[in-house]
Curated annotation (Swiss-Prot):
Gene Ontology molecular function: any one: succinate dehydrogenase activity
Designated name of the protein: Fumarate reductase subunit C
Function: Two distinct, membrane-bound, FAD-containing enzymes are responsible for the catalysis of fumarate and succinate interconversion; fumarate reductase is used in anaerobic growth, and succinate dehydrogenase is used in aerobic growth. Anchors the catalytic components of the fumarate reductase complex to the cell inner membrane, binds quinones.
Entry similarity comment: Belongs to the FrdC family.
Principal localisation: membrane
UniProt GO cellular component terms: fumarate reductase complex; plasma membrane
Organism expressing this protein natively: Klebsiella pneumoniae (strain 342)
């Protein structure tokens, strides 16, 4: 059975997401994937340079010292920190931690995740620089 009634389709512009701050931030957060791709490509380039010997590795180090690459890597770091912050804020919503019959608030979980991140970062830097 077919109908002749025309369904109402509400018009929607391509910039609908720009009207609400929540959606704008969501798009920025999802956009952090682009700098992550950049970092992945640079890392793979470094692995290939390491594989091909000292001369290739020296070229890779020279590439990393280029001011444009340094700026892109700083943008990538900022994007990674933003993405990490949003995931750490999401974690307490996904896990209900109950201590002595009461649900724990999100602050201790978020702070704990940042502490673990800082400790792991310091350990990795210590091993990389002084071991």
């Amino acid at each position: 059975m077919t109908t002749k009634r025309k369904p109402y389709v509400r018009p929607m512009t391509s910039t609908w997401w720009k009207k609400l701050p929540f959606y704008r931030f969501y798009m920025v957060r999802e956009g952090t994937a682009v700098p992550t791709v950049w970092f992945s490509i640079v890392l793979i380039y470094g692995l290939f340079a390491l594989k091909h010997g000292a001369e290739s590795w020296a070229g890779y180090i020279g590439f990393l010292q280029n001011p444009v690459v340094v700026i892109l890597n700083l943008i990538t770091l900022a994007a990674a920190l933003l993405h990490t912050k949003t995931w750490f804020e999401l974690a307490p919503k996904a896990a209900n931690v109950i201590i002595k019959g009461e649900k724990m608030g999100p602050e201790p979980v978020i702070k704990g995740l940042w502490v673990v991140t800082a400790v792991v970062t310091v350990v990795i830097l210590f091993v990389a620089l002084f071991w």
